[in-house]
Amino acid sequence: MKKLLSLLLAAVMVLSMAACGSSSSAPAATTAAANTSASSGDASEAPKKGIDMTFTIFLDPASTDDPRSVVLKEIVDEYNATNAYGNTVTVESIHWSQYESQLIQKTAAGNGPDIVNAFSDQLMQHIEAGTIQPMTKYAKEFIAENPAYIHTAEKLTQADGEIYSLPWESRVTVNWYRTDIYDKAPETWDELLATAEKSTDLAMGFAVGLSDGSNGTALMETFTPWLRSAGGDLFDKDGKAIFNSEAGVKVVNFIKQLVEAGTMDKSVLNMAYDDVVDAFKSGTVYAMDAGTQRASAIKSSDLASNFASAPIAGVNGAAPAFVAGQTLAIGSQAKDPDMAWDFIRYFYTVENQKKWMSAKCMTVRTDVFDDPEIQAMDDYEEMKMWSEYATTGSMTFFPADYTELETRIAQAVQSVVFQGADAQTALDSVADWYNNK
């Protein structure tokens, strides 16, 4: 109980990551119910009576501003109208900035949902807080029956031997750049450093946000693949922090070099994730690293015809991909796990994955790319490139206290780049704090 209360208190102070990006509001629960023709199961397999279930997610099915919300409503409506059991799913939308804290509070109060959307970076937080339960049996059967699903049971299995969720979309951090400014995207650190000549008094060239705002996420989505490109990693197999390695020092000093050379402007000190994306969209930044979940927002810019994306530059070639994704799990207080699973598996059909692709969410099924409708999409080749680049990395399930760690790493990098601190000393301080907590 002490551990749960501790996690609850911590979660109230934490901003969680959004999803394929973030939703713009935090509305009350919305019930989805409409008429469609798809079916999620065979009536002969329905010995149970239907039940009412709740589904928490950061998207709002009542909103038409976000294409992902529109797809969510369509999928839930179809399930409610056609599932073999007569189940009804009610969506409870929670804004991404309050998602973990509110969900943990609801569960602690005995009002946990039947179905939980959990971002991969925060999955361990849900496991430790007890908001979700193992779904190993369902997951292994599903993966065995669906060879086109991109995730393996082995990679989704946690330290306790259980699988707690299945990713329903993927996103990978890529380099976005202006084709009217650069002939091609840089592939190596040296090539990236050389783009300093494109920076002007009116526009920054390349930008990685170094602010510790939003938990330092802007930095970590580049720091991590660069660290792996240099031969290091954040943690060892036992969960010990090892980013203060020679590779980690090399990355921090390279970031400092980018600022000193003028490749990045000093204003990145105060730029968080959204600041960098907005600057790129407005034309005051010429290149950046950002997740593919931001594609719809990025391409809403008047300059979008000059935007392109590519793998992130690494030490001697493309850096290993930083992969994350939204996942679905069975709530720890689900009234009937079998029924919760019946809804969850409906998310992963080819038809529903095609719908998510139309909303610029990367599919978790390779066979979706074989569909003629998908191949006819204007950005088919780009999205296929994202999917192929994602195979160079793997989804990482970070520890429950990862949010505080990434904030401290961002602060350490700031001290080196802008205050002249020693990179090894700065990283050692954060690693020692983490390993001795």
Positions of predicted regions on the chain:
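Extracytoplasmic/periplasmic substrate-recognition and gating elements
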Residues: 51, 78-88, 261, 300-362, ...
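Hinge/lid segment of periplasmic solute-binding proteins
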Residues: 34, 41-42, 46, 119-174, ...
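Extracytoplasmic "Venus flytrap"/periplasmic binding protein-like
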Residues: 82-149, 180, 185-187, 279, ...
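Conserved N-terminal structural module of periplasmic/extracytoplasmic solute-binding proteins
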Residues: 6, 20-128, 316, 339, ...
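Long, aromatic- and glycine/proline-rich binding clefts that accommodate carbohydrate-like moieties
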Residues: 310, 358-408, 415
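Periplasmic solute-binding protein
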Residues: 124-131, 136, 150-190, 211-237, ...
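Conserved C-terminal helix/tail region of periplasmic/extracytoplasmic solute-binding proteins
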Residues: 46, 260, 388-437
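Glycine-centered hinge/linker elements that transmit conformational signals in sensory
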Residues: 195-202, 239-268
